[in-house]
Design a protein with these regions (language model features):
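Predominantly flavin-linked oxidoreductase catalytic cores and closely associated redox partners
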Residues: 107-171
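Conserved N-terminal/central alpha/beta ligand/cofactor-binding core
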Residues: 2-122
Length: 172
């Protein structure tokens, strides 16, 4: 069984082990997950705190449509709303968090990510294993500062995933 060697002491950060894409690269940990996508503000993050609950749900539903369009068409969307289990929880004084969940499964999730990358690779520049120190606005665009160089762009999509979420909170 593979295990990430980062322990915080001897190995403080990613050593970019060649066969390991557990937390980074296109899809990051999601490339090896079971492909469950939650559509809810009740758990899983606080995007709604920045853009409002309705906008957050709209974005999650957009991501769901993209997942379906890029290979997840035969998968099911589950919901806790109005279920027998939801009623049973209420009868017993429990509050069931409301969510819709698209379960792609590991294999289909990987196909979706492959299809997305194939669609985007010629339309955008991807930089993997390029730790970003800072991002600043400048001359109607953005300057992305890495350990080795600086990049200027008119539009910038920062996709840090779980492994970079704490850093992203500091930058924003």
């Amino acid at each position: 069984e593979r295990k990430c060697p980062i322990d915080g002491k001897k190995v403080p950060s990613c050593i970019r082990y060649k066969t390991c894409s557990i937390m980074s690269g296109f899809g990051g940990a999601g490339a090896f997950s079971d492909g469950k996508y939650n559509i809810t503000n009740d758990f899983g993050g606080d995007l709604y705190a920045h853009i409002g609950k309705e906008n957050a749900i709209e974005l999650m539903e957009y991501v769901d449509r993209v997942n379906v369009d890029y290979g997840g068409a035969g998968t099911k969307l589950y919901s806790t709303e109005g279920t027998r289990f939801s009623k049973l929880c209420l009868q017993n004084g429990l509050h069931l968090l409301q969510a819709k969940v698209r379960h792609l499964g590991t294999d289909i999730n990987y196909v979706v990510l492959e299809n997305l990358y194939a669609e985007l690779k010629d339309k955008a520049d991807f930089y993997f294993h390029s730790p970003v120190k800072n991002i600043r606005t400048e001359k109607g665009g953005y300057v992305v500062v890495t350990e080795k160089e600086e990049f200027f762009c008119k539009q910038c999509v920062v996709s840090v995933g779980r492994s970079g979420s704490k850093w992203m909170e500091q930058v924003c």
